[in-house]
From Swiss-Prot:
Keyword Membrane carried by entry: yes
UniProt-annotated location(s): Endoplasmic reticulum membrane
Recorded family membership: Belongs to the RFT1 family.
Residue ranges that the Swiss-Prot or TrEMBL entry lists as coiled coil: none
Biased composition (Basic and acidic residues): 1-11
Biological process according to GO: dolichol-linked oligosaccharide biosynthetic process; glycolipid translocation; protein N-linked glycosylation
PANTHER family: ENDOPLASMIC RETICULUM MULTISPAN TRANSMEMBRANE PROTEIN-RELATED (PTHR13117), PROTEIN RFT1 HOMOLOG (PTHR13117:SF5)
Protein source organism: Yarrowia lipolytica (strain CLIB 122 / E 150)
Principal location: endoplasmic reticulum
Segments passing through the bilayer: 192-212, 216-236, 257-277, 288-308, 450-470, 486-506, 524-544, 550-570, 588-608, 613-633
Protein name per UniProt: Man(5)GlcNAc(2)-PP-dolichol translocation protein RFT1
Reported function: Intramembrane glycolipid transporter that operates in the biosynthetic pathway of dolichol-linked oligosaccharides, the glycan precursors employed in protein asparagine (N)-glycosylation. The sequential addition of sugars to dolichol pyrophosphate produces dolichol-linked oligosaccharides containing fourteen sugars, including two GlcNAcs, nine mannoses and three glucoses. Once assembled, the oligosaccharide is transferred from the lipid to nascent proteins by oligosaccharyltransferases.
Top-rank taxon: Eukaryota
Length: 673
């Protein structure tokens, strides 16, 4: 065995960088306080240096793996050796910021990306309206359903489960394992997230193969090619999933923003280019279905490449691996080595996947099956009950109508899920419960304002605006009964937006704190709601001949049921934690706002404010400003408190949690004595 170089004891925090080669010891442990008398003794204790002698290797396999813990003292800052490589912590740069402020900043960044995304989609739709038909939009909607199904079944459950696996309170990387990383350290937790990300990759291969075999979804030429291209795009997208989940764990929203911003623009250019090439072939329908497939493939290639590059750049100095790697459990006994260093001897076997997280992901996956049937159930019903024309009408209304929902509400939902997952652990403190209640009440109350605007002005204003956007080709979107036209469906969709927004906010709380048993109960409830949704949708679309409008009303019924279930769950959650519950009066607007809003809604129902010209639009804008003024006057104090809450500079939650943990530790020590 080669002689190991000696090390002068610099300080208690210095890391040895010269013991063995990089191949021999992936991560060098901290240097000891006192120089040992025997170099071979260091090699035996390390467990990370590869022995050249076969007899020694045989002997080493009988030794348990070991983790070194250097003595730690508070308020000691060690100077860095100028020859020592600089180590950057994989802990996200936002750890020192308050959790609420970080979540709000991330949500703001995602809102910016959604604005860019929807502006690009808006421009693309406007260009496609010049060359595409409602039937082409209907065919592309079915391709989008295939893509969303593969991605949802492959990654949604894993993503939601991994949001519980945060870096808060994890041990620093002074714990070193010769064969990899250690459980409950920063690097060990990051490695667990990366390992779980590869489950999505494997699931994506399976579901993509199943979807590719089901290419006879609609009787259009090139349908088989289009479906197979979409499935390839899904697998390419999922190839970067380990990098995505790591970026979200580290709260690196900029990586996601960069990936989506570039990919969205490329997708729009590719989709429109292929649509132009196919416009002269059978009205553009047969060749046009390939445009969406090629556009999505370009999106997946760009987004995956950007994710991989940015996440690797952010984690250049790391102790974990981007490939699946074993994690050493931290279930052990303390021993004292000959050189007075604390050594943890591990008898448990290393693992790749965290079992509680896997079980949670399994429970969530069952629940997401029902959730997907409800979320995408409208596409299933519209493809079963309605022709391609009505499918196209619903698709274009969904693209335009969901602009506000996806620009504003979806990023808020993502931010709330991240916030609640980090704030409310297994044993949340009283301060954490109070803060979560304040944030939830504020969001729900704001959404009631949105509901007033949507119900008061949406049905009267949006049909005219949408008809204007359709332009000269608007006639082909108004065939048949007026109630089945695209503008009429858009007016109904305005009523659906606040239900969708409120449900997203409440379910983000449920998904952040629910146990596997809670998720199973939710899955059963969603199964019942899906039956109700399908029954009501079929009745309204087919029996009452409402077309796509019937589907919108069925969605409102569905969202109402889901909101009711979430409200009951949240009530019992706070009761079970013996915390002050949500006061219903805190969720309702003031009397002045309610009076103004009800007056506006009644006027809309009786035809007052019906828009047929831009002059009428101006009148409605004036009424909307009056409602906004009433909100500002009535809710000025609540709005100021919300702004102060978001801009809070000190994370009192972390301080209180630390104090409670110290009290529990003192209590347990007293009981042991």
């Amino acid at each position: 065995m080669d002689e190991l170089p000696s090390h002068e004891p610099k300080n208690r925090y210095s890391r040895s960088s010269s013991i063995g080669s990089p191949a021999d010891a992936r991560y060098a442990p901290p240097s000891p306080l006192h120089e040992p008398s025997d170099a071979s003794q260091i090699a035996i204790a390390m467990g990370g240096v590869r022995q050249r002698s076969a007899s020694i290797r045989k002997h080493r396999r009988q030794q348990p793996s070991q983790v070194f813990i250097p003595p730690m003292h508070e308020n000691v800052t060690a100077p860095r050796d100028e020859h020592e490589p600089k180590m950057s912590s994989p802990v996200p740069e936002t750890d020192e910021k308050p959790l609420l402020q970080t979540s709000a900043a991330g949500a703001t960044l995602l809102i910016g990306i959604q604005i860019l995304s929807k502006l690009a989609s808006f421009g693309l739709n406007q260009m496609l309206l010049l060359v595409a038909t409602p039937a082409l939009f209907g065919a592309n909607a079915q391709l989008e359903f295939v893509l969303n199904t593969v991605l949802f079944f492959s990654r949604e459950a894993v993503r939601l489960a991994l949001q519980r696996l945060t870096l808060a309170g994890k041990k620093p990387d002074v714990y070193v394992f010769g064969g990899g990383v250690v459980q409950d350290t920063v690097s060990g937790t990051s490695q667990a997230v990366i390992n779980m990300g590869y489950i999505s990759v494997l699931l994506g291969v399976f579901f993509s193969s199943v979807a590719a075999a089901s290419h006879s979804l609609f009787s259009v030429a090139y349908a088989s090619w289009a479906v197979q291209l979409v499935c390839i795009a899904a697998m390419v997208d999922l190839a970067s999933e380990p990098y995505y989940v790591l970026a979200m764990q580290q709260l690196r929203f900029r990586s996601r923003a960069a990936a989506e911003a570039v990919a969205i623009l490329v997708r729009c250019v590719v989709t429109f280019s292929f649509t132009l090439l196919a416009k002269d072939t059978d009205g553009g329908l047969n060749g046009g279905v390939l445009a969406f497939a090629f556009g999505q493939l370009a999106y997946s290639l760009i987004s995956s490449a950007v994710y991989i590059y940015t996440v690797r750049q952010d984690n250049r100095d790391r102790q974990f691996s981007f490939r699946p790697q074993k994690i050493q459990p931290f279930e052990s006994q303390m021993e004292m080595s000959d050189n007075n260093r604390d050594v943890i001897t591990h008898n448990a076997s290393p693992y790749y996947l965290d079992k509680p997280t896997v079980r949670l992901a399994g429970s969530i996956w069952i629940q997401t099956v029902f959730k997907h049937c409800l979320t995408e159930g409208d596409r299933i019903l519209v493809s079963y009950f309605l022709p391609l024309y009505d499918q196209g009408v619903y698709a274009i209304v969904l693209n335009y109508g969901s602009l506000v929902a996806r620009i504003v509400f979806f990023p808020i939902e993502e931010g709330l899920r991240t916030f609640f997952s980090n704030l409310l652990g297994e044993k949340p403190s009283e301060t954490a419960l109070k803060l979560s209640r304040q944030v939830l009440c504020s969001v729900v109350r704001i959404y009631t304002y949105v509901a007033l605007f949507a119900a008061g002005f949406g049905p009267t204003t949006l049909p005219f605006i949408f008809g204007t956007l359709l332009g000269a080709r608007g006639g082909q979107w108004s065939e048949g009964a007026p109630s089945r036209s695209a503008p009429a469906v858009m007016g109904a969709f305005a009523l659906y937006i606040p239900f969708m927004a409120l449900n997203g906010a409440l379910e983000s709380f449920v998904q952040s704190v629910a146990t596997p048993a809670d998720l199973r109960r939710q899955a059963v409830a969603l199964g019942v709601f899906s039956v109700v949704f399908a029954t009501v949708g079929g009745l309204l679309m087919k029996t009452m001949d409402l077309g796509a409008r019937g589907l919108v009303f069925a969605n409102i019924v569905n969202m109402t049921l889901r909101i009711g279930w979430s409200v009951v769950f949240i009530y019992h959650y706070y009761v079970s934690h013996k915390a002050e519950n949500v006061n219903p009066t805190h969720l309702l607007p003031g009397k002045l706002v309610i009076a103004t809003g009800v007056t506006t809604i009644l006027a809309s129902l009786f035809g007052v404010g019906r828009v047929s010209s831009f002059r009428d639009v101006g009148i409605n804008i004036g009424l909307a400003l009056a409602l906004a003024a009433a909100i500002a006057v009535e809710e000025r104090q609540a709005l100021v408190q919300l702004v102060q809450l978001v801009r809070k500079k000190e994370d009192k939650v972390k301080v209180d949690d630390k104090e409670e943990k110290e009290k529990e530790s003192d209590k347990s020590e007293g009981e042991s004595e």
